[in-house]
Amino acid sequence: MKPPRLTDTTLRDGSHPMRHQFTRQQVATIVQALDRAGVPVIEVSHGDGLAGSSLQYGFSHTSEFDLIETARQHAERAKIAALMLPGIGTRQELKEAVARGVQVVRIATQCTEADISEQHFGLAKELGLETVGFLMMAHMRPPEELARQAKLMESYGADCVYIVDSAGAMLPQDAAARVQALKDTLSVQVGFHAHNNLGLGIANTLAALEAGADQIDGCLRGLGAGAGNAATELLAAVLDRLGLNPGLDVFSLMDAAEYVVAPIMPFQPFPDRDAITIGYAGVYSTFLLHAKRAGAQYNVDPREILVELGRRQAVAGQEDWIIDVALELSRRHQSSARKESRP
């Protein structure tokens, strides 16, 4: 293993549990703390990427462009990154983000849809950006298929391609196999982004590093969607113990998590019943509330709904399946009950 490059995404993935309510002052304080601690890349944007502020994904308290500008002003050494999802962010948003200080763009697609990112990588390269590809929900497809998708992103201009465990559903061997497949296929760097829904964020990141990952992600205090991400301060401590510290100040990151981020967190993400269900089922956390509502309407345990959605490999944008699955399960339960009641 070699020391990886760490991207802290507290100010992007952490926007989900913060309900996209970060302020300029909070961004300034967090960026300063991360920058002083030696974090080389800090991601700042709406939780769903550039232009995510909307009725569908949740409105931001402060324009993400203002937050990006604030981050750039307070980062002496770190690069500022932003997430972009084709279909949400457009050319205009990316150009504005660059004008405000973005130096790295991370372009995210569903893990089977890398082909929709070609124009976005092309524009990013025209703008002189470092480019990173994100293959989301990567637990759903086998390693060899992910490698083919990653190869497309590489051909479009990606400088690194990430395996992204969006649902926190992977086991360590899953993370290792997927990273290894990309390392065997690509000539560019490979990254890994963990979520902690099964309590394996750190373990999966270590497995990815053992398989050759060049870049990894973390959030201070684990502040991220679902049960959160691998905690940046924990990653720093573990990397230091392994002799793989890439220049991070472990104590400074511990202090940043404890005294800067913890006081503003609405709650501490952890693997509670809901988060475990998301990881166990392998679905997006955005399905959870809809499944609970459908479960109440049709008298079905929402966990059953989520597990069935995972079996059907539902992804974001297919929330309409939830009612269909709830109704189908309700009818199935009623049929079973009738059979059991017969003499």
Swiss-Prot record:
InterPro entries: 2-IPM_HCS-like, 4OH_2_O-val_aldolase, Aldolase_TIM, DmpG_comm, DRE_TIM_HOA, PYR_CT. GO terms for molecular function: 2-isopropylmalate synthase activity; 4-hydroxy-2-oxovalerate aldolase activity; manganese ion binding. SUPFAM superfamilies: Aldolase, post-HMGL domain-like. The keyword Iron does not apply. Keywords: Aromatic hydrocarbons catabolism, Lyase, Manganese, Metal-binding. Residues 4-254 form the Pyruvate carboxyltransferase domain. Mn(2+) binds at residues 13, 193, 195. Substrate binds at residues 12-13, 166, 193, 284. Gene3D superfamilies: 1.10.8.60, Aldolase class I (3.20.20.70). The keyword Acyltransferase does not apply. The record marks 12 as: Transition state stabilizer. Belongs to the 4-hydroxy-2-oxovalerate aldolase family. This is 4-hydroxy-2-oxovalerate aldolase. It comes from Chloroflexus aurantiacus (strain ATCC 29366 / DSM 635 / J-10-fl).
